[in-house]
């Protein structure tokens, strides 16, 4: 999949046009949604990372990246990276993401995230992903380099998009 993803608003329109049943059927895989980027740590002060949504995200804010290979056991890992490379399944065009940054896979019915030895690291809810894969349930904040994303299961994504539609009425 290339880096030309769709945005949350596109999915909200699609849900309104298709109805929930058809939308659920069509979107049966988990997704990553860009929610911002980590601010650089201040040299003085608390040193706490914060998430910003400045326009420096170059069109990535609220972009949705489906993870279709994560929908079924035994499908093999889905590789996330920044460049078109052999074996990269989902391309996120952000300089702080490595060419082959991380993988998502299904293991014993659980979605797990592993770092591929990326230069700028991977974290889940602020905790670095070490050598052991991290289990995901949905709703986690994932940092890939400086980019902040949320991981949503397919049902969680449908619920999120549905809540957007309800709020906009």
Question: What is each PLM-predicted segment?
Answer:
Residues 80-82, 113-117, 143:
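Catalytic Cys-His active-site segments of thiol-dependent hydrolases/isopeptidases
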Residues 86, 96-98, 118:
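Short linear Ser/Thr-Pro motifs
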Residues 1, 106, 117, 123-169:
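C-terminal boundary/linker segments immediately following FHA domains
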Residues 102-104:
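Buried hydrophobic-core signal for structured, non-transmembrane domains
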Residues 1-92, 156-169:
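Intrinsically disordered, low-complexity acidic Ser/Thr-rich regulatory segments
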